[in-house]
């Protein structure tokens, strides 16, 4: 298939630049992946769509304030976006500047918050393709503490506004736990603590995986045929406890419901690993990077239902949804969402989708 097959017209006013005040009050488009049937709901209705004994899989990654502003020793301004923390003092980052810093260049970070000539000193140690390896000069302060002091919440480029104090809470799931993401697993933003308590009281089971969402999630697909696209790598943790819960849920005839595409990619990576290594179990623990790319024709081994936001045209995420619900069903649902003026992207509305069982084997 061609990347252009996943394009659609989206009026700018449908891009949500601020979240709803009440997390569960957003709209929910329910899509039956088997027949394409559509229902218009409110997100709080998921309480009626999820049954006792079903298993919800959440991504518990915590978004770090990964964007920093500063300057090079030469005086040139820089914008630094942490992609991955390597240890307490080193990180990989995207750096925007008029001229890329060279190996050994000194950087001064956070002067927009700390004042001129008071920036935190760092050194560009090496370049790895499009990423820069940076090390803090002062080893007495950990990177996470530095980010809490001078970092900005890394809002996606399409939100097109500076981050605000409220984003520290709004652009974070209520169950986030493990620091490391530079983008939120946005489907989870719609759950508040009250809804989680109601689901638990109903007998719905919860498990948590970790996938640290990278800035690569916003990168455009630059090839013509989707099969030629190479996904960026992101770190994933799927524990034995999660695997046991998934296997037990399947044996009981209940559904595994992934909250967000990152949860899908996490557990499907673990299931694919089990198959490739000849593990007789459906899924096995997974603690590694994944670059799994799911597009129409790929097989889902575990996930039965998906809760997800509305994604960018021609993105790998709309391709994943198309693989799950069927291409025609997905594009038709997006057409309806635009007509009905749903809000799109990270701070927008959501979908609840059950899988289209008519999919080919993963090649």
From Swiss-Prot:
Task: Give the residue range of the signal peptide.
Answer: none
Subcellular compartments: Cytoplasm
Read off the Pfam families from this record.
Queuosine_synth (PF02547)
Q: Which reaction does it catalyse?
A: 7-aminomethyl-7-carbaguanosine(34) in tRNA + S-adenosyl-L-methionine = epoxyqueuosine(34) in tRNA + adenine + L-methionine + 2 H(+)
Positions the record marks as coiled coil are none
The Swiss-Prot or TrEMBL record describes its family as follows: Belongs to the QueA family.
Pathway, per Swiss-Prot/TrEMBL? tRNA modification; tRNA-queuosine biosynthesis
Alphabetical list of InterPro entries matching this protein? QueA, QueA_dom1, QueA_dom2, QueA_sf
Task: Name the chain's protein.
Answer: S-adenosylmethionine:tRNA ribosyltransferase-isomerase
SUPFAM superfamilies the record matches: QueA-like
Give a GO molecular function annotation for the protein. S-adenosylmethionine:tRNA ribosyltransferase-isomerase activity
The subunit structure is: Monomer.
Keywords, A to Z, come to: Cytoplasm, Queuosine biosynthesis, S-adenosyl-L-methionine, Transferase
Q: Answer whether the UniProt record assigns the keyword 4Fe-4S to this protein.
A: no
E.C. number, please?
Answer: 2.4.99.17
Q: Name one GO cellular component term.
A: cytoplasm
GO BP annotations listed: queuosine biosynthetic process; tRNA wobble guanine modification
Q: Which organism is it from?
A: Haemophilus influenzae (strain 86-028NP)
Instruction: State the protein's purpose.
Output: Transfers and isomerizes the ribose moiety from AdoMet to the 7-aminomethyl group of 7-deazaguanine (preQ1-tRNA) to give epoxyqueuosine (oQ-tRNA).
């Amino acid at each position: 298939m061609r990347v252009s097959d996943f394009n659609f017209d989206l009026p700018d006013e449908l891009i949500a630049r601020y979240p709803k005040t009440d997390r569960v009050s957003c709209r929910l488009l329910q899509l039956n992946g088997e027949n394409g049937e559509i229902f218009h709901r409110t997100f709080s209705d998921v309480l009626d769509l999820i049954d006792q004994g079903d298993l919800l899989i959440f991504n518990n990654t915590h978004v770090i304030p990964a964007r920093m502003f500063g300057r090079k020793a030469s005086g040139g301004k820089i914008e630094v976006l942490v992609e991955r923390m390597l240890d307490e003092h080193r990180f990989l980052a995207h750096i925007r500047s008029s001229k890329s810093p060279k190996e050994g260049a000194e950087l001064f970070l956070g002067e927009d918050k700390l004042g001129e000539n008071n920036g935190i000193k760092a050194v560009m140690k090496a370049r790895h393709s499009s990423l820069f390896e940076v090390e803090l000069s002062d080893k007495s302060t950990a990177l996470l503490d530095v980010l809490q002091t001078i970092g900005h919440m890394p809002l996606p480029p399409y939100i097109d506004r500076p981050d605000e104090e409220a984003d520290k809470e709004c652009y974070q799931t209520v169950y986030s736990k493990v620091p490391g993401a530079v983008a939120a697993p946005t489907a989870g933003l719609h759950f508040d603590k009250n809804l989680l308590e109601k689901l638990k009281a109903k007998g719905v089971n919860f498990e948590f995986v970790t996938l640290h969402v990278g800035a690569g999630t916003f990168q455009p697909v630059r090839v013509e045929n989707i099969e030629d696209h190479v996904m960026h790598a992101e770190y994933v943790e799927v524990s034995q406890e999660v695997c046991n819960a998934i296997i037990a849920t399947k044996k009981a005839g209940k559904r595994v419901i992934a909250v967000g595409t990152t949860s899908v990619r996490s557990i499907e990576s673990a299931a694919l690993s089990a198959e490739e290594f000849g593990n007789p179990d459906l899924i096995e623990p997974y603690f590694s990077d994944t670059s799994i790319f799911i597009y129409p024709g790929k097989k889902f081994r575990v996930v039965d239902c998906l809760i997800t936001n509305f994604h960018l045209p021609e993105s790998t995420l709309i391709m994943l949804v198309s693989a799950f619900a069927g291409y025609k069903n997905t594009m038709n649902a997006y057409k309806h969402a635009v007509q009905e003026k749903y809000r799109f992207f990270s701070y927008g509305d959501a979908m609840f989708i059950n899988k289209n069982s008519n999919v080919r084997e993963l090649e």
